[in-house]
Amino acid sequence: AESEYGFDIEHAYLSLEGSFLNEKLGFFLQADFADSYPLLDAWVSYAPWKQLKISAGQKQTFTNTRQMMMLDQGLAFGEHSLMDRTFSRTGRELGLFVESRLSLGKLGFDLGAAVTSGDGRNSFGSSSTDPDLGGLKYGGRVTVYPLGFFTSGNEMVFNDFIREKSPKLAIGAAYSYNVGASNMVGEGHNDFQMYDKEGAADYPDYRKLSADLLFKWNGFSLLAEYVNATANG
């Protein structure tokens, strides 16, 4: 038999990022042209002061594990872990996001709250006949840095290419409540239909709790994560 050769493109990213007015206004756009629905991220942000940022649009949400907060190019391997792929899809949501960074001496905190569509990426479907279903998703996250903050940006990639000169540790926890999910992990819509005894649409509420730990020092990286999800209704 004759041999056949070929190759596939897993991802083909195009990213645009910028800021204005002394970094008070910002935007981020990312597309994956190897995907049938290329748009991944499209959001704008406003930072009235250094400790607070308000974003609106479709972006990587912080209500998942830390690995799901990382852009794909920041992962240790070519894809997310089996656990993260079980409990999440792309980790992107359409909505409003509020983030704050605070410090108390050497102790650091990242705080976040989000209200999103609850239907994941491209949540309003491919056409007007594929509408958003269920209610909104509410979530939040707290991350503590007991040894001080990482070098800028180094907490959002797995590998310690910067080689932190002193040990750095991030301990985080996130929770989300999705009202009326029609996707098995609350990151999609119209994947199944459920009805009450009167025949009206009745989708289950989906809750997810996660915890994670990221440690880096002098090129060494360690990431541990835990997820628990329940649905009822």
Role assignments for model-derived ranges:
Residues 143-146, 150-233:
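Detector for outer-membrane/organellar transmembrane beta-barrel domains
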Residues 1, 37-43, 68-72, 123-129, ...:
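Outer-membrane beta-barrel translocator domains and adjoining extracellular loop/strand segments
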Residues 1-121, 129-149, 167-170, 175-177:
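Outer membrane beta-barrel
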